[in-house]
């Protein structure tokens, strides 16, 4: 992995080309963990963010949505931000995030993991964002209900990856807040119906389940 910043733009380069022999890994592998660790190590000095600064940015983005955001979603996101603000250090980022780290956006080439489609890369993501992105994409293949999937991801982060209960829960909440904001920002504003997007109901149920678990912890 080569990385540098030119004129405020992050440049990442790879010399690998996907071939028919390249393998798409359909579950978490040590190659994913090694890649994410290297990405954090190489970008931490320029891209790591405190939890408080992330919350400030997300709150500003939320405010920009204005009256187009339906009251239930505003209340849900306001509640989530308040939960995260109680312990902002739990979501502090370690460096640059890919932003869309799913099995279809990476492949194994010999002993290396090659990652492409960096259009969502940036710094405004919480801790473990890319890891959760991968685990969430894998979990969706199982067809579980949102609440069950959220609980399963919490358990996997704790049991398999050594996160505390609060770390797992808050980082999942932050992950879903970021994706809700991204989805909302991509929608055209419609005065008669407000902002909406495909998958909004499922996202609401998932975030509600995580917030309920946060209250119980």
Where are these regions (language model features)?
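Regulatory N- and C-terminal appendages and interdomain linkers associated
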Residues: 8, 199-217
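Extended charged low-complexity segments that act as oligomerization/scaffolding linkers
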Residues: 9-11, 158-172
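Short, polar/flexible loop-turn hinges at active-site or ligand-entry regions and domain interfaces
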Residues: 19-26, 122-123, 142-144
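Phosphate/pyrophosphate-binding loops and the adjoining catalytic core of nucleotide-dependent enzymes
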Residues: 22, 43-44, 167-176, 210-214
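An alpha-helical support segment within catalytic cores of ATP-dependent transferases
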Residues: 45-98
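Active-site acidic catalytic loop and adjacent metal/ATP-binding pocket
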Residues: 85-129
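Active-site activation/catalytic loop segments of kinase-like enzymes and analogous catalytic loops
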Residues: 128-162, 176-192
């Amino acid at each position: 992995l080569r990385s540098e910043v030119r004129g405020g733009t992050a440049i990442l380069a790879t010399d690998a080309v996907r071939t028919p022999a390249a393998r798409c890994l359909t579950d978490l592998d040590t190659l994913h963990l090694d890649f994410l660790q290297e990405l954090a190590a190489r970008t931490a000095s320029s891209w790591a963010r405190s939890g408080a600064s992330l919350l400030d940015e997300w709150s500003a983005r939320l405010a920009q949505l204005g009256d187009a955001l339906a009251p239930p979603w505003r209340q849900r996101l306001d509640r989530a931000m308040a939960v995260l603000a109680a312990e902002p250090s739990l979501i502090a980022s370690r460096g640059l995030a890919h932003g869309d780290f799913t099995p279809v956006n990476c492949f194994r080439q010999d002993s290396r993991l090659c990652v492409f489609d960096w259009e969502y890369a940036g710094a405004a993501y919480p801790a473990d964002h890319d890891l959760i992105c991968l685990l969430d994409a894998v979990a969706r293949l199982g067809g579980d209900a949102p609440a069950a999937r959220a609980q399963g991801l919490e358990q996997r982060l704790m049991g398999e990856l050594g996160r505390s209960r609060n770390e797992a829960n808050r980082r999942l909440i932050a992950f879903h807040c970021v994706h809700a904001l991204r989805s909302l920002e991509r929608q055209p504003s419609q005065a008669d119906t407000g902002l909406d997007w495909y998958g909004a109901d499922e996202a609401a149920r998932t975030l509600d389940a995580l917030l309920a678990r946060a209250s119980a912890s």
